[in-house]
From Swiss-Prot:
One GO-annotated biological process of the protein: adenine biosynthetic process
SUPFAM superfamilies: PurM C-terminal domain-like, PurM N-terminal domain-like
Gene: purM
Protein family according to the UniProt entry: Belongs to the AIR synthase family.
Listed name of the protein: Phosphoribosylformylglycinamidine cyclo-ligase
GO CC, any one term: cytosol
Compartments where found: Cytoplasm
């Protein structure tokens, strides 16, 4: 018995692993940008920081996954957008700190290497990288029989970006009177899916609920997370934004306070939030308390910006998309977020 046969008999298909690498090369090539050094397949991805032209570079990194949204991708056998979700969760976090994404790495663990399926996953990762301007410079695909079921996989990612030291957004400039501007989300994004799956556990995904404006439930649930990088970078370069909150797990209540000091609070006017139909459906069919929705989901706004009043018009001009003025920064009395 050769080592190869022994490994195959233990459930690891080395040849399938090689096929995955060949299949994903064309997708990785889409993500090339200035600064990338070396080719896919080396022991480490390389990037020449001097190519960015940043005078006082600060590296900002982030890592994340997509939670149990993956279980819906597996259930519905749709794998071509979940990679974009993974990239979005990482790059949206680092752009909130003022970083331009430079490169990305992914990690996929699976019970059985299925090259066609894994190519779809990486194609989604590459699409997310293209949308955010990050190069996909490396990754790992681990076949782990016994750890995962044959149809199961997990996905995580790692993003590294750069910011000028003077352009870092750490919340220290957020001040009383700053205006809170919201940018629309594409849907649920990639958090709260354990609850989402419970609410719709008895649904096939083919249903067209009256709240969903003609779309199938599975299409809405797997709508990829919006990537905000290209919208926000011009604002960061002009130093127009005092704070940025990426509205992910914990919704408004947990994430908005992360962009300002402890003596401040966010006063938000609920009637100015463009609540998406899926959130109305979740609240209705899940019998979820209205206030709790804001503790879990983005409700239709994936990014909240704190902007000085005199800069609001310029920010809206640069964004060239619907921007929602949803509240202001006030002195803290009790709660960090007040939804009125």
């Amino acid at each position: 018995m050769t080592n190869k046969n022994a490994y195959a008999q233990s459930g690891v298909d080395v040849e399938a692993g090689y096929e995955v690498v060949e299949r994903i090369k064309k997708h990785v090539a889409r993500t090339e940008r200035a600064g990338v050094m070396g080719a896919l397949g080396g022991f480490g991805g390389m990037f020449d920081l001097s190519q960015t032209g940043v005078k006082e570079p600060v590296l900002i990194s982030g890592t994340d996954g997509v939670g149990t949204k993956l279980m819906l991708a597996i259930q519905y056998d749709k794998h071509d957008t979940i990679g974009q979700d993974c990239v979005a969760m990482c790059v949206n976090d680092i752009v909130a700190a003022g970083a331009e994404p430079l490169y990305f790495l992914d990690y996929i663990a699976t019970g059985k290497n299925e090259p066609a399926k894994l190519e779809q996953v990486v194609a989604g990762v590459a699409e997310g990288c293209v949308q955010s301007g990050a190069a996909l410079i490396g990754g790992e695909t681990a076949e782990m029989p016994g750890m995962y079921g044959e149809d199961d996989y997990d996905l995580a990612g790692f993003a590294v970006g750069v910011a000028e030291k003077s352009e870092i957004i750490d919340g220290s400039k957020v001040a009383e009177g700053d205006v809170l501007l919201g940018l629309t989300s594409s849907g649920i994004h990639s958090n709260g899916y354990s609850l989402v799956r419970r609410v719709f556990a008895d649904y096939t995904g083919e249903e067209v609920l009256p709240e969903l404006e003609g779309k199938k439930l599975k299409e809405v649930l797997l709508e990829p997370t919006r990537i905000y990088v290209k919208a926000l970078l011009p604002l960061i370069k002009e130093k127009l934004v005092h704070g940025i909150a990426h509205i992910t797990g914990g919704g408004f209540i947990e994430n908005v306070p992360r962009m300002f000091a402890d003596d401040l609070a966010a006063e938000i006017e609920e009637d100015k939030i463009p609540v998406l139909p899926i959130f109305k459906a979740l609240e209705k069919y899940g019998h979820i308390k209205h206030q709790e929705m804001f503790e879990i989901f983005n409700m239709g706004l994936g990014m909240i910006l704190a902007v000085a009043p005199e800069n609001v018009d310029r920010v809206k001009e640069l964004l060239d998309e619907p921007v929602y003025e949803v509240g202001r920064i006030v002195k803290k009395e009790n709660e960090s977020v007040l939804i009125k």
